[in-house]
Amino acid sequence: MSKEIAKKRIEELRDLLNTFNYQYHVLDNPSVSDAEYDRNMQELIKLEAENPEFMSEDSPSIRVGGTVLDIFEKVTHKSPMLSLGNAFNEGDLRDFDRRVRQGIDDANVRYICELKIDGLAVSLHYEKGRFIQGATRGDGVTGEDITQNLKTIKAIPLRLNEEVTLEARGEAYMPKRSFVKLNEEKEQNGEDVFANPRNAAAGSIRQLDPKIAAKRNLSMFVYGLANVEEKTIPSHSESLDYLGELGFKTNPNRRTCETIEEVIAYVEEWQEKRPHLDYEIDGIVIKVDDVALQESLGTTAKSPRWAIAYKFPAEEVVTRLTGIELSVGRTGVVTPTAELEPVRVAGTIVRRASLHNEDLIREKDIRIGDYVVVKKAGDIIPEVVNVIFDKRTGGEEEYHMPTHCPACESELVRLEEEVALRCINPTCPAQIREGLIHFVSRNAMNIDGLGERVITQLFDADYIRTFADLYSLTKEQLLQLERFGEKSATNLVQAIENSKENSLERLLFGLGIRHVGAKAARTFAEHFETMDALVKATEEELKAINEIGEKMAQSVVAYFDNEDVLELLQQFKEYGVNMTYKGIKIADLQNVESYFAGKTVVLTGKLEVMGRSEAKKKIEALGGKVTGSVSKSTDLVVAGEAAGSKLAQAEKHNVEVWNEERFLQELNK
C-alpha cells in the first residue's frame, strides 16, 4: 500500500470510528456491531503503526491508552470550580426561590433542573476545537492533569465540530452495568472490590496507566461552559444545546421550569425514577437559566446565589446488628463500631457503622441481636439511627464496654470532662500502629507510597515499632511484603530518605503530641527554630506564644518530659532526620527578594497550616499588601477551604488564584 493510499484510508477509518463512537456513547444509538467496530479499530491501529508519520493526537486509537505516567502534574484552574449550596427538603427549595425572586425584584425567572451525577468532576480544555488538557476538580483551585486517561473515555470528543477555544465542565462516571462487571472480574481475581460506582470511576480515572482506565468503560456528561472565546450565550439551557452541537454528551433528562412547584415536581419525579437509571445520581441541580440574572444575583461567601443542589434524603435501611467491635485510635480513645449483616445503603454494601461512644449505646439502648435502622450521614459515613424495638425477641444481649484495652489489656480510664474511654498505655500496639499511620500522613512527614495498608504490613512483620524504625527499613525487607516489587520497594526507600529533609513543623505534627495540630506545630517550629530549643521550653514560655493555651503548653511539656521520647529524638538525629525550621521567619523577611513585593493579595477561606493572620503578617513583611476585597488592582488571591465569592470575583477580574500549598511553596523559597 502506497503512503498516499495509507493516509487516505487512515483518515477514512478515523472519520468512521469517530461517527461510531458518537452514535454509541453520546446518542446511545449504535449503528454497527461490536465486531465490526473492533475490525475497523484494529485496521486503524495497524496502519498507524506502519505509518507513524500520519499519527495524530486526536485519533480514535488514542482511546485504548498510552504510556504509563510517573505522576499526575498539578493544574491551576483558569476559573475556580466552585461548589453549590445544598437543599434537603421542599422548604429549602422554596426558600431558595424566595431569595432568588427578592434578588431580582420579582422579575420573571425560569429555572433549569438537571440530574446531579454521582461521579468525578472534571474540566476539559479545547483549543481551536482540539482537546488539549483535562483535569480533576481537586480543591476547586488546583486539580491534577488527567488528560491521557480522559482521552480513553469515548463520550469525550477529541475534536469538536467547530474550531472553538473553550473550557467545558462535567462529571465522569461509571455506568452501573460496567461497575457490576468490573467487580465480578475483581472477585474472580481475588482482588478487593469497589464500594460503589463513584469510587470505581475516581479510582479508574486516577490510574497512572491509561490502559487500565481504557478498560473500565467510563462515560461522561458535560454540564456547563466555564470559558468560551468570542461567543455570548444568553442562557444555561442554550449553552447545553450548544455543547451538544459541538459533540459533547449532555444529559437528556434536564427540564426548564417556570415555577418552584414545577421544580419540586421534577425533584419528586426523579426521586422515584432514580433506581431505573444506568448511572448513580445523588440529587438535582437547580439553576436560574438566564445568564444575565445569574450575574445580577452574584454569589455569597460560599456559593452562587443563582444555583442550589437538592440532595436526596439519606437512604435508610433495616438490618441486624450482630456484634460490637472496638478500635483503639492513636490517642488511645476506644471507639465502638457496630457489626451488621451486610446491607446496601446509598449504593454501597455496608457491614459496619459508627456507634461513637458508650453513652450513645446507652441512650439508644442498642443491644447485640437488635434490628436497627442504618443510614449514611451525608451519604458518606454509615451510622445506626435507632433500634426497632418491635422486632425484639428477648434474646438480645446488652452491651457493656470493657474495663481493659482490647489491644493491650491495660486498664481503660475516662479522663475528666471526656465521654470516651481511653487507653493510656504508651506501648499499646494499636496506638503505635495508628500513630505510625499519622506520622507518614500528608500534613506530617508526607511519605509517598506509605499509607495504612503498608504500615500495617510493616507492623505485622515486626519491622517497625517506633517512628525512627522507618528510617532503618531496607529494600530487602520491603521485598518480603505482599505487592512489593523491585521498583516499588526502591521508590519507597527513596521517599523515606527524602522525608529526612522536611522542615521541623512536619516532624512535630507527625509526633502526634496531644492538642498540637498542624498550625500549632508550625507556630512552635517558627518560634523555637530547633527541636532542642522546644524540648527545653517551660510551660510559661510556651503560653507566652500567641494562640498557645494552657492545655497545649502542659501537653507539650509532658510529652518531652519522657525518656522514651528523648531516646526517639536521639535516634532521629543519628538517622539524619532534620530537626530545624526551614521556613522563613517574619523578622527575616525584610531582607528577602520576594514575589510578594509590591503585590496586592487577598486571602479567602480557611488556611489549614498557616492562619490568615499569620499569612497576612508574612506577606506584608515581604513587601506585599493584603486587602479584604478583590478588584482590578488585585494581583493574587490565596484560597483555602470553603472559599467562595472572592473566587468568583477573581474569575471576573482575571486574577491569579493559588491554593494554600502553592502559597507555602512560594513563602518557603
Curated annotation (Swiss-Prot):
Gene3D superfamilies documented for this protein: 5' to 3' exonuclease, C-terminal subdomain, 6.20.10.30, BRCT domain, DNA ligase/mRNA capping enzyme, Helix hairpin bin, Nucleic acid-binding proteins
Residues binding Zn(2+), per UniProt: C405, C408, C423, C428
Domain BRCT: 591-669
Active site residues per record: K116 (n6-amp-lysine intermediate)
Cofactor: Mg(2+); Mn(2+)
GO cellular component annotations of the record: cytosol
Xref: SMART domains: BRCT, HhH1, LIGANc
Catalysis performed (reactions): NAD(+) + (deoxyribonucleotide)n-3'-hydroxyl + 5'-phospho-(deoxyribonucleotide)m = (deoxyribonucleotide)n+m + AMP + beta-nicotinamide D-nucleotide
Keywords, sorted A to Z: DNA damage, DNA repair, DNA replication, Ligase, Magnesium, Manganese, Metal-binding, NAD, Zinc
Family of the protein in this entry: Belongs to the NAD-dependent DNA ligase family. LigA subfamily.
PANTHER family registered for this protein in UniProt: CHROMOSOME TRANSMISSION FIDELITY FACTOR 18 (PTHR23389), DNA LIGASE (PTHR23389:SF9)
NCBIfam families noted in UniProt: dnlj, PRK07956.1
Function: DNA ligase that catalyzes the formation of phosphodiester linkages between 5'-phosphoryl and 3'-hydroxyl groups in double-stranded DNA using NAD as a coenzyme and as the energy source for the reaction. It is essential for DNA replication and repair of damaged DNA.
Protein name: DNA ligase
Lineage: Bacteria, Bacillati, Bacillota, Bacilli, Bacillales
